Amino acid sequence: MGKVVLITGGSSGIGKSIGEFLHHKGFVVYGTSRNPERVLNSIFPLVSLDVRDADSIRLAVAKVIATTGRLDIVINNAGVGITGPLEEIPMEEMKNNFDTNFFGPIEVMKAALPQMRTQKSGLIINVTSIAGYMGLPYRGIYSASKGALELVTEA
């Protein structure tokens, strides 16, 4: 069996493309989606996971481990953008941005690390953004959430 990969946000966009590439290279890929039953034509299995819900994260990681017996690679790809002048962005949207782009990936890492430590191997890739290295006009909250994830990744 190839290395087992879990990709958050694996049902569309960059996550789906990464998953398809790795699948064709022989990796055992599991993608995640908030609504996997709505996704058509995925070439790899999708498990239900909402990065804003810690229980959902723990269940999805546990399901992959129970199915495969291991977890070799986690790609924290799920993310959401937010734009606008700071004073016009509702606080709820700001919190949702941080829950999705920062706290969600932290919860995924917390759920995956015990298995990786047991295996004595594992790789976690956190997808950030150039916006995390410099503030972009009207993208301050997004930049802050990606910058926070970048710093945790480096630590």
Model regions: which residues?
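Conserved glycine-rich cofactor-binding loop
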Residues: 11-12
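Rossmann-fold cofactor-recognition segment
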Residues: 43-55
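Substrate-binding pocket helix/loop in short-chain dehydrogenase/reductase
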Residues: 85-86, 90-95
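Active-site loop immediately N-terminal to the catalytic Tyr-X3-Lys motif
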Residues: 87, 134-140
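Active-site helix of classical SDR
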Residues: 109, 145
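Residue(s) in the substrate-gating loop at a strand-loop-helix junction
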Residues: 129
